[in-house]
C-alpha cells in the first residue's frame, strides 16, 4: 500500500481549424514536428533500452514506423493543402480517421495500434502547439491512478517509486 498519485489529463488540447497564410510554411512546421517526434521517440527508446525486454522495446520501433509512415504524412500534407488549414488540426483529423478505421476492425492488436496513433497524434499536436505533455514526478513511492498513461509518460517515471498503476 501507498499514497495515490492522480494523473490528471483533463486539460484538453485546443484544436481549432484556422486558415493559414502560407501552406508551405505550415507543411514545413508539420515536417519539423515529425522530426522532433521521431527524435523524442528515439531518445525514449534509448532511455528504456536497459529497463525493458527486447520485445517491450519494440513498441518504440512501432512508434517510429508510424511517425515515418509516408501515407500518414502524405494524407496530412494533402489535408493541409486542400483545406488551407493549420497542421495541428490536420494531424487531428487525419489520425482520427485512421484510428476510427482501425478500431472498427475489432482486433485487439489493431486497436492497440490505434491507441499508439492517438498517443503519437497527441505528441505531434503538443509539438506543433509548443506545449509539453504532463510528466509524472513522484517524490515518494506511490500508486499511479490514471484514465490512461502513455509509454512516453511511463518512460519518465522513476521505477523505484512506482508501487502500482491503475488505469
Please give the residue ranges for each predicted region:
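Non-catalytic, soluble scaffold/interaction modules
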Residues: 1-167
Amino acid at each position: 500500500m501507498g499514497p495515490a498519485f492522480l494523473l490528471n489529463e483533463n486539460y484538453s488540447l485546443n484544436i481549432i481549424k484556422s486558415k493559414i497564410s502560407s501552406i508551405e510554411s505550415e507543411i514545413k512546421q508539420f515536417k519539423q514536428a515529425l522530426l522532433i517526434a521521431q527524435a523524442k521517440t528515439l531518445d525514449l527508446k534509448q532511455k528504456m533500452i536497459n529497463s525493458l525486454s527486447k520485445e517491450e522495446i519494440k513498441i518504440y520501433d512501432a512508434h517510429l514506423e508510424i511517425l515515418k509512415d509516408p501515407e500518414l504524412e502524405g494524407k496530412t500534407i494533402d489535408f493541409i493543402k486542400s483545406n488551407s488549414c493549420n497542421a495541428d488540426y490536420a494531424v487531428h483529423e487525419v489520425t482520427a480517421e485512421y484510428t476510427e478505421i482501425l478500431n472498427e476492425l475489432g482486433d485487439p492488436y489493431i486497436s492497440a495500434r490505434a491507441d499508439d496513433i492517438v498517443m503519437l497524434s497527441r505528441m505531434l499536436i503538443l509539438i506543433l502547439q509548443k506545449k509539453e505533455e504532463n510528466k509524472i514526478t513522484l517524490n515518494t513511492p506511490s500508486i499511479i491512478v490514471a484514465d490512461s498513461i502513455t509509454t512516453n509518460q511511463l518512460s519518465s517515471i522513476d521505477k523505484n517509486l512506482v508501487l502500482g498503476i491503475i488505469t
